[in-house]
Amino acid sequence: MADDTASASEDATRSYYDTHDVDAFYDAVWGGEDIHTGIYTDEHEDVAIASRRTVERAADTVAGLLGKESTVLDLGAGYGGPARYLAERFGCRVVALNISEAQNERHRATNAERGLDGLIEVVTGSFHDIPFSDGQFDVVWSQEAFCHSSDRERLLGEAVRVLEPGGALVFTDLMAAEGASVEALRPAVSRLGVDALATVDFYRRTLTGLGLRRIDFDDHSGQLLHHYVCVTEETRRHRPELRNTISPAYLDSLLINLPLWVDAARREQLRWGVFHCRRA
Ligand SMILES: C[S@@+](CC[C@H](N)C(=O)[O-])C[C@H]1O[C@@H](n2cnc3c(N)ncnc32)[C@H](O)[C@@H]1O
């Protein structure tokens, strides 16, 4: 059971992702598969295509470790887009841990439709208390989930604990720029159920302290502005049909919150990219 700091953000996240409103929004705007920042190669590209490219790039960093005999743990697995990609590309087993049972139900159903339920196990639980024993996984993977944690030192400790020696931790996360004002970002960040984002320096320092080596950060911060402009425009474009599927209050709150992320990205107050490192 997580302590109070971690469990406050867990409750907020669970109730956020378990609502029908949030489910319908991610389905309409991201395609309900990958829900993280995209890497765009063309300004007219769909959010879903760019978001899939992020999975491909992150997977390239651990391709040498993955095959039919390996197992990946995906922390905060969402609807399972990354888990299915990894299982299909490498034939590896994936354990997908996620706190939202509503997402997990959809995740399991999609895996079964695609014949991937034999390779992917979907588990309900929190990355603050990973329900597996030490050193079990070849790769621990996560995309845009650590931003929901109010105890990131604890979750990183857990991620490293379950990684086998020589295994890799790879993750993407929304972060604050060094020196960005926590107060100024708070109105945007509050939608994630936390007070503040991590920084690149925090991750480097904490991962080093946990004994990880070859810590690399592929900096794609320049993608954030375009991504949030696209997501905001898509939300506005889908507004008429979203009005029929999600509550007006949630839609209005999104249309207030998303432009705050656009503004923060424009002011270069945010960072984003792919971290990858190895356990000694
Ligand atoms: C923005 S979504 C990203 C989903 C997925 N990783 C992807 O990229 O498509 C964030 C995910 O983190 C999960 N999450 C947040 N806090 C969590 C926690 N404490 N333990 C496990 N999962 C958590 C949410 O339920 C959600 O699925």
Where are these predicted regions, by residue range?
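Conserved Class I S-adenosyl-L-methionine
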Residues: 216-280
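Short alpha-helix
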Residues: 195-211
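Class I SAM-dependent methyltransferase SAM/SAH-binding core
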Residues: 71-73, 81-129
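Short, glycine-/aromatic-enriched active-site segment of Class I SAM-dependent methyltransferases
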Residues: 174-195
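Conserved alpha-helix/loop element of class I SAM-dependent methyltransferases that forms part
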Residues: 32-39, 45-68
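A short glycine-rich, Lys/Arg-flanked "PGG" loop and its adjoining helix->strand segment in the class I
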Residues: 153-168
